[in-house]
């Protein structure tokens, strides 16, 4: 077996970053919910 989590900054931003979230309707809903909840960090 090997470790399944191989962190990469670029990949993380591309998949879960602010620009990616803003690009789709559902992503914007995610940001809205996180703002309402009062999250300090909205995205990765």
Swiss-Prot record:
Gene Ontology MF annotations: structural constituent of ribosome
GO cellular component: ribonucleoprotein complex; ribosome
Pfam families associated with the record: Ribosomal_L34
Organism: Clostridium acetobutylicum (strain ATCC 824 / DSM 792 / JCM 1419 / IAM 19013 / LMG 5710 / NBRC 13948 / NRRL B-527 / VKM B-1787 / 2291 / W)
Compositional bias of kind Basic residues: 7-22, 29-44
Region described as Disordered: 1-44
UniProt name for this protein: Large ribosomal subunit protein bL34
PANTHER family: LARGE RIBOSOMAL SUBUNIT PROTEIN BL34M, MITOCHONDRIAL RIBOSOMAL PROTEIN 34 FAMILY MEMBER
Family: Belongs to the bacterial ribosomal protein bL34 family.
Keyword tags: Ribonucleoprotein, Ribosomal protein
GO biological process: translation
């Amino acid at each position: 077996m090997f470790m399944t989590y191989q962190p990469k900054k670029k990949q993380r931003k591309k998949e879960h970053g602010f620009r990616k979230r803003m690009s789709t309707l559902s992503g914007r809903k995610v940001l809205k919910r996180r703002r309402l909840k009062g999250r300090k960090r909205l995205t990765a």
